[in-house]
Amino acid sequence: MSFLWSFASFIIVISVLVAVHEYGHFWAARKCGIQVHRFSIGFGKVLWSRTDKQGTEFVISAIPLGGYVKMLDGRNEVVPPELSSRAFDQKSVLQRAFVIAAGPIANFLFAILAYFTIYTVGIPTVKPVIADISSNSIAAQAQIEPNTQIMAVDGTKVSDWETINMLLATKMGNDEIHLTLSPFGSSIEQHKVLNTKDWRFDPEKESAMSSLGLQPVRTKVDMILSKVEVNSPADKAGLKAGDRIYAGEQLISWQQFVQFVQEGKPFNVKVERDGQFSFVVLTPELNKKGRWYVGIAPTAAPISDIYRTELKYGILEALQKGVEKTIQLSWLTIKVIGKLFTGDLALKNLGGPISIAKGAGISSEIGLIYYLGFMALISVNLGIMNLFPLPVLDGGHLVFLAAEAVRGKPLSERIQNLSYRIGAAILMALMGFALFNDFLRL
């Protein structure tokens, strides 16, 4: 995946979602009779502009990392008496709150529309069937059996591994997780309880489900090497593409092999090449990301059709599913943010623009429907983040308006300005920390 592809995919995501967000503010302002001076996508030098009959200038600027809607406002300019009724600051608290909240609401509506489209067209996925259970894991202690399908997590129905993984991640810090299971192909329900009191995991190194010992049905892996990286530990040991790897007399599984590598210690493997057998010692090394690796890729076969499914519904059900998915993602986002503040999830998991760019590039390469799903996810995150009660964000403005409604008058300009400075400092610190984490992951 090229840098340019990821960058272009990222710019499209940000530009579309910013346009959606700002259009929410713009539409609400027009509905409330507020004069809008400018609707801008991006910052900096103006690349294109057009002014409509109502005097609003629509602008595309050079730096596509944000946007804004500039409204007539007596706090920032001298308003002619004949236009005072069209100034933002002269509108009622309820009208101003509507204009401010309309941005995040537009992001949520976009997510609903995106998921409605996805579920109408149909999106291929893999049924959440457990292929194997890692030994000595939390799932093993709960006596969960392979070849069972996860039907619900703490009562929330699930139909794919992506949703399960996100749900499990939000359970960090909980003492227990309740799973509803069914033997694959059966309607008989089983209920298992995962003891997660001491459960912790690093999302950079493993998924929530794998850290619990749940191994999903994956592409079938044959331990015939399809690739050996140049100058990798495997290359130094003499391994070549086409070699078949064994552990003693038993054919090693990819999961077992990964466990050996992650221990970071030298281990012996038996190698078959052109009908001849030999033994080599593989010594894992740390890569740039601080992970143990040996530099090989196995041969992969497609997942059996019996485990494949397509999430596709009629128009009304697709709309319902779109609403449910958006609500679910919103709640999951809030819970994850909460766990970042409580320490249940480390702040190093906070991602910034580089992480978004990577996700945009990967999803766009997989297919348009997955790219749309990624945009919906980021749109939900954008909506939630903008509702944070920081003065520089929409949520902070809503807090000021709530205070005005209670007091009968706005907070003093001094308090508001001080709050803006503090909010801006906090936001810049979070953005800087997220960007720092992004660079560490490169």
Curated annotation (Swiss-Prot):
Enzyme Commission no:
3.4.24.-
Biological process, per Gene Ontology: proteolysis
Q: According to its record, how does it sit in the membrane?
A: Multi-pass membrane protein
NCBIfam families associated with the record: PRK10779.1, RIP metalloprotease RseP
**Segments traversing the membrane:** 97-119, 366-388, 418-440
**So where's the catalytic machinery, residue-wise?**
22
**Where does the PDZ domain start and stop, copy by copy?**
198-286
Please report the name of this protein according to its UniProt entry: Putative zinc metalloprotease PM1991
